[in-house]
């Protein structure tokens, strides 16, 4: 691994992705018109940013370079990324910083709960970096954060987006026992692309993780998502849908992959809005309760509204 170190600045800054420094640049095609988003400039955006910084929190909105940050933060919606800003994995698609993380902040669960209260969130999304350095992958910390939010904001519904807890026995059970309302774990891509896109993960382990959630608590909503435009074929996307339905997953998200930098995996193709609509139609026909499929779809985009629709869809089935 090549590590690039800043030796010029008075306060040297470690690059976000040292493991990618030696890679050749990967060029992507020009973004089509349907990908354009406005720069974040609203008062709501500024207020959200102030509350996040005041509580010393990290958001995946910023760290992953989410294109929807302006829209979401204007509405005071933010996805908190706990357990630090540094991930132990080095996925080819992800903009989150990689390296050896710092020790967990034991006060973080309370800070997340306080920010949730100040933002007046009715639905909160909590995600995290991968913490392969921890014996439980950070499961106890995630559970503590869920409990802290429940105590401070009892009417707020909680959605978590978790790592895969690969080789972390008992970690999943710890998180499910904390009773989040939605358990989300993203597959990210089709199985054939894992070696180049998500080399530190295992596709069928992730499927089994989602299946296990339903075995532990059949009432818990489960959710997963993939990006398209990474070189996958249509039939592979349809197979992912079948695999997720075999695990009884309720909610599927499909969005366009966007390249964070020239050192990341290239965009192989921009999928058209019509193709996304087609995927949504097929997914509903396969039995998903909720599907969000569009170029700008991201796991946490419109999460609160989508949770309400998810509840309504389940209620309709029981009538």
From Swiss-Prot:
Cofactor note: Binds 2 [4Fe-4S] clusters per subunit. One cluster is coordinated with 3 cysteines and an exchangeable S-adenosyl-L-methionine.
EC number(s) given by UniProt: 2.8.1.8
CDD domains to which the protein is assigned, alphabetical: Radical_SAM
Keywords assigned: 4Fe-4S, Cytoplasm, Iron, Iron-sulfur, Metal-binding, S-adenosyl-L-methionine, Transferase
Catalytic activity: [[Fe-S] cluster scaffold protein carrying a second [4Fe-4S](2+) cluster] + N(6)-octanoyl-L-lysyl-[protein] + 2 oxidized [2Fe-2S]-[ferredoxin] + 2 S-adenosyl-L-methionine + 4 H(+) = [[Fe-S] cluster scaffold protein] + N(6)-[(R)-dihydrolipoyl]-L-lysyl-[protein] + 4 Fe(3+) + 2 hydrogen sulfide + 2 5'-deoxyadenosine + 2 L-methionine + 2 reduced [2Fe-2S]-[ferredoxin]
A single cellular component GO annotation: cytoplasm
Residues that coordinate or bind [4Fe-4S] cluster 2: 87, 91, 94
Pfam family, one: Radical_SAM
Record's subcellular location: Cytoplasm
GO molecular function, one term: metal ion binding
Stored SUPFAM superfamilies: Radical SAM enzymes
Source species, domain of life: Bacteria
PANTHER family, per database record: LIPOYL SYNTHASE, LIPOYL SYNTHASE, MITOCHONDRIAL
Listed name of the protein: Lipoyl synthase
Organism: Rhodopseudomonas palustris (strain BisB18)
The organism's taxonomic lineage, starting at the top: Bacteria, Pseudomonadati, Pseudomonadota, Alphaproteobacteria, Hyphomicrobiales
